[in-house]
């Protein structure tokens, strides 16, 4: 060491001067405790000469105002703390030296992070994201107006689309907000007398046949019995379109009942029950909405599983826009099996009738109209047409406007309206009146101004502890993705919401509401990336059994599983492994589990030898962590490290090419990665990435269990796998799957079951990850260094209950992370 001193002295002195010149207020002299560790174990590789990994510790300053600088210091701390640095082949630092240096650095990072939070808050001044904006208008005005497509998509950070630091505001946003507010206000304004709620039953074969006559005639037929038989729903959106019906009152809710069944035709007729040969699988009936054009894609899909044993009645409820109608189509019928005589083809969906009820409403005028115009009378614009173009009428326009605006602004701004608020919006109302606008038009202009103002678009939070109104907004956005309701605002007015017992009770109330489903969807969309379930389309040759209904069932499975964990306060161990799954018949069939019938999800005990259980073996998770053609242990490994363990890997170097899958089956992904890992620059990261990815290799891109890879043959005739009931050949069985691997710490596993056990040995890591993901979603800010202490406290506090999910949620909401800006 003495012999090295002259060579090391210049950089040691530079390091000392640099550290001393950037002292934190945390604990004077804390950097002196880093110098011995850096000098003895770090500078050999990380000085100005070597600079391995691009890191020069000899010139690295301390700058609390620079987020990138603090992230780099945090990375240094984590690498040393996790014993990844120094490298395994290097001498280990003495325990007391390592402990002292880490304690000093951890304290400095915590102090400066906490000071920033006290000064500026954890969450930057943020706006409502797209879903929050749409839900808020829907709940405020009571109209399910189609606004989602009007607004730009939100960027994400840490997987979530409500993170304030990522939510920009552009001129496009402002233009779209004006359009959306105008559309929502007009839709909420009543202009007709109460519509008649009617129930109509239509002969489906007649209405459908008239609309689709001469189109895709090999896809459908009207049987001699008068039923409509549909053979293939995949050729175009007009298959099954109820073309003779349109909503008598657009943009209201309607309930559709469809009587249908799966059936087999025999010699041009529907086979009698005694002659029915049961189809090898049920047919899925899809109900959706579509526009008048045959090119209109259906949306708002709902699926029902039809049995061949008897007719069933299937219900679908939706808000129907103008120019839209019902769309019915069967799934799981092979389109390539079509023949010129459809009634001789066999398996089909038979529709007897469709019943339509609506419009459905609780009161008239609806609640949204009453919020805007109170109990003002509706009078016709033209007395000669007493039931057309009704308008709210006021004898005292100024007084009524002031009364109505105060109530509206209090709901829209999520706090009582100030006198300045009232003055600004009344001024616009009076200006519109002077310009000759009608009362309702003038009032809507003021409402539109409110819905495009910062008080509506942005969260009103100040550094420090949130006031009760800000707390009400944060709680409702967290669990409902919407504005607080009247009860939350009433408690905020009383100053009672911030009391721990009241806050807990309100958390329970919000979770019990149907609107809490938004929490399930948005949280899982960010945490597990389920919002990207549609981003890939599995290759139809390799995965011909994949279909929209299977995908919807996968998504519903994960959502129902999360809701079960939350409702029953089950342990976060279930994230990795559970002894049950939420299944319907289609999913059970896909997973190879017997005894499940029907399209409704229910809790199903898993067989002892099942490889399923937990989020990581669910179809939706396995689909979003793969592309449409192949699985990648690297991609899935990164997914598990980030989403399940909370240790996201660093992004790959820009000069490292991605691996292209060999869909011909000549080379396995393990063989490709072995060559890739032999490169020194790649080995370190892959030691962490590859094990969890290979543990999941027995699951293909659609979540099916496999023991071999599917491959596409050079010649189609060489394919050995057929679609049932057809002559279509798709793929061959390729090389065998090998899911075994060894973790970076030396622990080995043979398959997913063994890997799960290794993860379950450290449930506190699973809990910590869930707490960090919850805090990001609930507050709109990704984890910061000062949050680590709070997260550790929450994990410790919930350990006696085995880290129950509901306990974790309550603990986050009652913590400084949630209660402070």
Describe these PLM feature segments:
Residues 10-21:
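Bacterial N-terminal signal peptides
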Residues 58-61, 86:
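Residue-level detector of conserved, well-ordered beta-strand and adjacent loop positions
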Residues 1-8:
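N-terminal secretory signal peptides that target proteins for export/translocation
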Residues 28-50, 68-75, 79-84, 88-821:
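Low-complexity, glycine/serine/threonine/alanine-rich intrinsically disordered linker
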């Amino acid at each position: 060491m003495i012999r090295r001193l002259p060579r090391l002295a210049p950089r040691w002195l530079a390091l000392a001067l640099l550290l001393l010149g950037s002292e934190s207020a945390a604990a004077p002299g804390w950097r002196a405790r880093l110098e011995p560790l850096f000098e003895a174990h770090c500078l050999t590789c990380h000085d100005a000469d070597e600079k391995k990994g691009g890191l020069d510790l000899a010139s690295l300053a301390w700058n609390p105002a620079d987020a990138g600088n603090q992230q780099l210091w945090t990375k240094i701390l984590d690498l040393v703390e996790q014993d990844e640095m120094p490298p395994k082949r290097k001498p280990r630092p003495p325990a007391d030296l390592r402990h002292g240096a880490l304690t000093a650095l951890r304290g400095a990072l915590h102090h400066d992070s906490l000071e920033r939070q006290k000064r500026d808050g954890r969450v930057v001044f943020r706006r409502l994201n797209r879903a929050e904006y749409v839900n808020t208008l829907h709940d405020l005005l009571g109209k399910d107006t189609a606004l989602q497509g009007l607004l730009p998509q939100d960027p994400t950070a840490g997987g979530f689309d409500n993170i304030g630091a990522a939510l920009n505001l552009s001129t496009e946003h402002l233009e779209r907000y004006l359009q959306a507010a105008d559309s929502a206000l007009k839709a909420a304004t009543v202009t007709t007398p109460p519509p008649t709620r009617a129930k109509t039953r239509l002969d489906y074969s007649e209405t459908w046949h008239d609309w689709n006559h001469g189109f895709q005639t090999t896809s459908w037929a009207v049987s001699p019995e008068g039923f409509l038989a549909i053979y293939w729903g995949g050729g175009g959106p007009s298959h099954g379109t109820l073309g003779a019906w349109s909503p008598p009152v657009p943009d209201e809710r309607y309930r559709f009942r469809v009587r249908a069944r799966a059936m087999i035709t025999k010699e041009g007729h529907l086979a009698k029950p005694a002659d029915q040969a049961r189809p090898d699988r049920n047919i899925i009936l899809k109900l959706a909405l579509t526009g008048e054009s045959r090119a209109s894609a259906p949306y708002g899909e709902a699926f029902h599983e039809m049995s061949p044993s008897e007719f069933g009645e299937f219900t679908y409820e939706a808000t129907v826009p103008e120019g839209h109608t019902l769309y019915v189509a069967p799934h799981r019928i092979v389109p390539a099996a079509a023949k010129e005589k459809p009634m001789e083809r066999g398996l089909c969906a038979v529709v007897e009738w469709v019943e339509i009820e609506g419009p459905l409403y609780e009161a008239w005028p609806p609640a949204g109209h009453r919020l805007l115009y109170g109990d003002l009378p509706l009078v016709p614009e033209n007395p000669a047409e007493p039931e057309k173009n009704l308008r709210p009428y006021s004898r005292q326009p100024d007084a009524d406007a002031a009364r109505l605006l105060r109530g509206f602004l209090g709901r829209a701004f999520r706090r009582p309206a100030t006198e300045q608020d009232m003055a600004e919006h009344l001024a616009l109302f009076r200006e519109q009146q002077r310009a000759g606008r009608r009362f309702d038009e003038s009032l809507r202009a003021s409402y539109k101004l409110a819905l495009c103002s910062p008080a509506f678009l942005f969260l009103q939070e100040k550094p420090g502890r949130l006031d009760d109104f800000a707390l009400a907004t944060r709680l409702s956005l967290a669990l409902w993705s919407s504005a607080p309701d009247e009860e939350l605002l009433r408690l905020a007015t009383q100053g009672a919401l911030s009391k721990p017992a009241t806050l807990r009770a309100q958390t329970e109330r919000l979770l019990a509401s149907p609107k809490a489903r938004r929490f399930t969807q948005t949280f899982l969309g960010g945490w597990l990336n389920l919002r990207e379930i549609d981003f890939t389309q599995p290759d139809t040759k390799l995965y011909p059994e994949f279909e929209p209904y299977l995908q919807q069932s996968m998504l519903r499975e994960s959502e129902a599983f999360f809701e079960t964990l939350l409702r029953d306060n089950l342990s976060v161990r279930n994230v990795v492994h559970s002894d049950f799954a939420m299944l319907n018949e289609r999913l059970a069939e896909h997973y190879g589990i017997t005894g499940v019938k029907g399209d409704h999800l229910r809790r199903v005990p898993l067989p002892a030898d099942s490889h399923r259980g937990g989020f990581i073996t669910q179809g939706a998770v396995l689909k979003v962590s793969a592309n449409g053609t192949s699985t990648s242990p690297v991609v899935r490994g990164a997914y598990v490290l980030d989403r399940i363990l909370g240790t996201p890997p660093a992004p790959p170097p820009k000069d490292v090419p991605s691996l292209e899958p060999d869909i011909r089956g000549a080379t396995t992904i393990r063989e490709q990665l072995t060559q890739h890992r032999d490169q020194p620059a790649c080995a370190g990261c892959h030691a962490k990435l590859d094990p969890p990815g290979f543990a999941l290799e027995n699951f293909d891109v659609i979540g099916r269990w496999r023991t071999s890879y599917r491959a596409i043959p050079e010649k189609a005739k060489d394919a050995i796998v057929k679609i049932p009931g057809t002559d279509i050949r798709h793929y061959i069985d390729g090389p065998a799957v090998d899911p075994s691997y060894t973790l970076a710490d030396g622990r080995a596993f043979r398959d997913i079951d063994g890997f799960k056990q290794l993860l379950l040995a450290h449930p506190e890591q699973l809990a910590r990850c869930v707490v960090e993901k919850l805090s990001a979603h609930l507050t709109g800010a990704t984890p910061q260094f000062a949050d680590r202490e709070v997260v550790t406290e929450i994990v410790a506090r919930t350990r006696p209950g085995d880290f129950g999910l509901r306990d974790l949620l309550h603990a986050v909401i009652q913590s400084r992370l949630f209660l402070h800006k």
